[in-house]
Design a protein with these regions (language model features):
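C-terminal regulatory/interaction module of P-loop NTP-utilizing enzymes
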Residues: 1-307
Length: 307
């Protein structure tokens, strides 16, 4: 049996909740996360094999939301680790509660006793960070562990994750190896700002999330911005698609499409026009240079393309 395998009652509950790919896609849609067949298949296999799932794609295409939606579908906690340059075990896994250790030493001294290393470096003195909390989650269903933007971390941190990814375990030098009773469902995301190590990829299922078609994007943004004009949603999706095909440095993701539609709807816009685009361009393009590219190409042209 794989050390990552979910067994017993938890496995049965997961199989009952998502018996097949179609049911998984429908349940994800119920929490307003729309997937195509490829992504639904990857998530399903990740649950059943089980194996960590590595999602790569441009910023804003919905990688992080996949982990959040999966936790909602499985009705289990989401434990999120946001990666950054320089992150290490103290932030990700654990650190020792030195003030508590010192207090215990002083208390023991006042009683004429001495605390040994095994007593001071035991589970009671651990400050549990996201990775350890996910491993020690008591169930009944495994937690969803979202390791977000792993490409922001360095090679050493990737190496540190290998034991967790491959064996659902971590080793703490003073304690030993801690193995998960309910191995977490692991979703890693990357914006591909750098290549991840092959050792990480070998331990994961891989899926690239591309930008959705304008038709799919209309469905997504309408679900996320309740009460918005149908016509406006179509125009926004098509206009954003044209922006992605232009020479902008940072193409807008789905998150920006949602923000833009929300801003336009708040202003009472029902149909997109050049004036509305000009006023709200900062909701969808976050670099001045990119805004100038779109303005130079003509806002009227952008709007006509969005009809």
């Amino acid at each position: 049996m794989s050390p990552r395998e979910v067994t017993g009652e938890a496995a049965g509950e997961i199989r009952q909740l998502v018996p097949d790919i179609e049911t998984l896609a429908r349940r994800l849609a119920d929490v307003d996360y729309l997937v195509d067949e490829g992504l639904a298949t990857s998530i399903f296999l990740s649950l059943r094999l089980p194996q960590p799932l590595l999602l790569e794609g441009e910023a804003g295409v919905g990688k992080t939301e996949a982990g959040k939606a999966l936790a909602l579908v499985l009705d289990t906690p989401l434990i999120r680790l946001q990666c950054y340059d320089g992150i290490d075990a103290a932030e990700a896994l654990y650190e020792w509660n030195y003030p508590r250790q010192l207090l215990s030493i002083r208390l023991a001294d006042s009683r004429g006793a001495t605390l040994g290393e095994e007593e001071l470096f035991g589970p009671d003195y651990l400050i549990r960070r996201p990775l350890l909390r996910a491993l020690e989650h008591p169930g009944p269903r495994p937690a969803v562990l979202l390791v977000d933007e792993i490409d922001r971390a360095d090679d050493d941190f990737e190496a540190f994750l290998l034991e967790l990814l491959g064996e659902a375990a971590v080793t703490i030098p003073e304690i030993g190896t801690i193995r998960a009773t309910h191995p977490p469902i692991i979703v890693l995301t990357s914006n591909r700002t750098r290549d991840l190590h092959d050792a990480v990829k070998r331990r994961c299922l891989y899926h690239w999330i591309a930008y959705p078609t304008p038709e799919r994007e209309v469905e997504i943004v309408r679900r996320r911005v309740k009460g918005s004009s149908d016509t406006l949603a179509v125009q926004v999706a098509n206009a954003v698609s044209r922006m992605r095909d232009s020479d902008v440095q940072k193409p807008p993701g789905i998150a920006e499409s949602i923000d833009w539609l929300a801003a336009l709807s708040l202003l009472g816009v029902e149909r997109l026009d050049a004036a509305a685009v000009d006023l709200t361009l900062g909701s969808v393009l976050k670099y001045g240079e990119d805004q100038e590219v779109i303005r130079a190409a003509g806002l009227e042209q952008l709007v006509r393309g969005g009809d």
